[in-house]
A protein has these predicted regions:
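Intramembrane alpha-helical segments
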Residues: 2-88, 171
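Membrane-embedded alpha-helices of multi-pass transport/permease systems
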Residues: 98-117
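Multi-pass membrane catalytic core of lipid/isoprenoid biosynthesis enzymes
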Residues: 1-39, 114-165
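Alpha-helical transmembrane segments of multi-pass membrane proteins
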Residues: 46-50, 92-104, 163-169
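Alpha-helical transmembrane segments
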Residues: 85-96, 153-161
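Membrane-interface elements of multi-pass transporters and channels
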Residues: 33-34, 55, 80-81, 106, ...
Length: 171
């Protein structure tokens, strides 16, 4: 990590953060009004994530929300609307990321304890965390199956992909 190790100065960090944020909001403004209005919400969600591990075991949920901005944001950029389909796709991403991040956190449970960082494996144990990850991935598969009707043009290719992903997660 560049900032804690001193490879990047705090001044450089803030300059990059401010410049990136301005570029993000400007880019959203260039896309369409809805993207522009939602850009500040997206920034708050993304900025707040890095703090969540310091005070809640449910930081995995916040990370899922932050990453789900990408598919919903792409939808807003292209279609200039938020639809049920885009929210369902975003929800699938939320639950995929929750499960994935919990699995990843199981490998870091000891480091989380030492550094007093919060995670589901650190708070509830690895066994319970694995169950939460499984449920999260199952919810994701359900959302992807609900999307099947909307992805009618993809038909069997989409369904095969969902079945393959579900099979890999079960394996």
């Amino acid at each position: 990590r560049a900032l804690p190790s001193g490879q990047v100065s705090i001044r450089s960090y803030w300059a990059f953060l401010i410049a990136s944020s301005i570029l993000f909001v400007f880019s959203a403004w260039m896309l369409n009004p809805l993207a522009f209005y939602l850009s500040s919400v997206a920034l708050v969600i993304v900025f707040f994530y890095s703090l969540t591990k310091r005070f809640t075991a449910f930081s995995h949920f916040w990370l899922g929300l932050a990453i789900s901005i990408a598919p919903v944001g792409a939808w807003v950029a292209i279609r200039e609307e938020i639809s049920f389909i885009s929210l369902l796709l975003g929800a699938a991403v939320v639950f995929w990321l929750i499960g994935f991040d919990i699995l990843y956190s199981c490998m870091d449970v000891d480091a989380d304890r030492v550094n007093r960082l919060h995670s589901i494996p650190q708070r509830f144990g690895v066994e319970m965390a694995l169950k939460v990850a499984w449920v999260s991935h199952a919810v994701m598969v359900v959302f992807l199956l609900i999307l099947l009707e909307s992805m009618v043009l993809l038909g069997p290719v989409y369904l095969a992909g969902v079945v393959l992903v579900a099979g890999l997660l079960i394996y």
